[in-house]
Amino acid sequence: MSKIENHEGFKRTFKNHKLTLGLSIPFDSKNKEHIDFNEQVKFAQQAERLGFTSLFVRDNPLYSPHLGSVTENYDPFVFLTYLSAFTSKIALGTSSIVATLRHPIHLAKSSASLDLISNQRLLLGMATGDRSFEFPAFKVDESALTERYQTTIQSLRALWQSHSPNISNSIFELYEDSGLQVLPKHHTIPMFGTGYSRQSMSWLQQHMDGWLFYAQPFQDQKKLVEAWHSGTDRFKPFMNILMIDLSQNPNETVKPIKGGFRTGRKNLLQILKAYESINTNHIILRFTNDDRDIEALIEEVGTYITPHFPAHTI
């Protein structure tokens, strides 16, 4: 068994040929201008109580008015640390950290600290970034993103292994007897490629602990999942984000929307079972409803859907 498979968050969330469910947070509502921290915590605790396996937050360092109305976006490490204080079992994930815009030392220390504080519940989705206005703000050469992403991932592995690693690369050098004072319990934290992150699939299969992708038409996803699992040397989970506009009518038929579906809970269950049948291992649901309360959505899915996809016993 690898060190990753000993990680508590990984063990509860992932198992070959089994599916578990998570939620995208912070929640937002078109009916309310702002959902405060106390309500976010209430929803997180409700999700944990009802058997959801994870909560995933986004990382967008900058906002631009050209993006239009977007969900409030807190610093992912600060927000997840806050949530960790009010939850005990649910995995805490990022979807995803823009790895190319953060210094590896800061990133290694923040993630190690959160993983320890949360009792090894952190799942790190790692992205290259796709907002062109962010790269000049951080003085990052967009043409070098492929190499910078690889260097960051390799640097994190080294920084988590030892208190005094010897590292020399294009981003930083660490020659003296120095390193992180606090290391993760397992000397590693699960990291997941996001999309292709400007890499080949083979690089992701070799260097990442799993793959976080975007919802695809079913047959396309089936081919992608098969290609992913067939090229890894051990079980490395495949997961995706799925947009859901959940009807109050449990029998409503399926209507495709961007990144997911509008449907009732009965067809949603069948959709998720189909994803499980092709060895999708985790799905992060993101509610898009503008006609229902968040609490009611979590309650309905948690009552009728999550019991079919329970967290794995540690």
Annotate each predicted stretch with a short phrase:
Residues 1-86, 189, 288-291, 300, ...:
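N-terminal beta1-alpha1-beta2 module of alpha/beta enzyme domains
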Residues 34-47, 110, 193-203, 261-275:
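Short, acidic/polar
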Residues 1-17, 143-187, 214-314:
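An alpha-helical appendage that flanks or caps ligand/catalytic pockets
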Residues 16-35, 99-167, 290-291:
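Flexible, glycine-rich active-site loops centered on histidine and acidic residues
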Residues 25-37, 97-105, 187-196, 252-266:
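Active-site mouth loops of central-metabolism enzymes
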Residues 21-25, 55-57, 92-94, 122-126, ...:
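Hydrophobic faces of well-ordered beta-strands that scaffold small-molecule active sites
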Residues 51, 59, 83, 114, ...:
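Conserved, mostly hydrophobic/aromatic
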Residues 41-58, 205-214, 274-281:
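Catalytic domains of carbohydrate-active enzymes, especially glycoside hydrolases
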